[in-house]
Amino acid sequence: MRIGISCHSTAGGSGILATELGIALAKRGHTIHFVTTEPLFRLRGFYANIFCHTVNLVPYPLFRHLPFTLALSTKMFEVAKEHDIELWHVHYAIPYAACAVIAREMMPKDQRFHIVTTLHGTDITLVGRDPSFEPVITFSIERSNGVTAVSESLKRDTYEHFPVKREIRVIPNFVCVDQYPQAPDP
């Protein structure tokens, strides 16, 4: 399968989780295309079926702030079209799921990819509590083909604070214990 993944590229939990998931999927034979703002903190080494695309943020005098969401949506669209992406996995409803929805809508109808959104705490418990973000978070969740949350409490909070009807599946964060062997007990 040809899979796009978008996440924060920094050392935070969602970026680590998304990168490790991409590596695991690549090891199973899938082709992974990461779209991020900078090289992934966690991606070390070379994988023949992992590709990284960076979002080009061009300063534009009219805008006070760089139009990140527009640039991200465009890059997702370009990668999806050029590489025939079948599934896009995004970490965070905003901005990533919202941008994936825009990118998918730009695609010809017969080439539209599925979107899986993984919700993390900031989506729901911090940024999501601001009423100005509720409509776009709800829209992005509802327009996703699948939605996961990293904990039962996050799933409950999502249903409590957003008028979401889509099923949310809990997939807890994981750590590959083989990468971190325990020292023997003294």
Language model features by range: what are they?
Residues 142-152:
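A short beta-strand/loop micro-motif in the catalytic core of glycosyltransferases
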Residues 13-21, 132:
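Conserved alpha-helical elements of sugar-nucleotide-dependent glycosyltransferases
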Residues 71, 108-116, 122-142, 156, ...:
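Nucleotide-sugar donor phosphate/pyrophosphate-binding loop at the beta->alpha transition
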Residues 1-3:
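Extreme N-terminal starter segment of soluble prokaryotic enzymes
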Residues 5-11, 23-68:
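N-terminal strand-loop element at the rim of the active site
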Residues 72, 85-112:
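An aromatic- and histidine-rich active-site surface loop
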Residues 153, 174:
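Carbohydrate-associated surface elements
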Residues 8, 119-122, 172-173:
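Histidine-centered beta-alpha loop that forms part of the nucleotide-sugar donor binding/catalytic region
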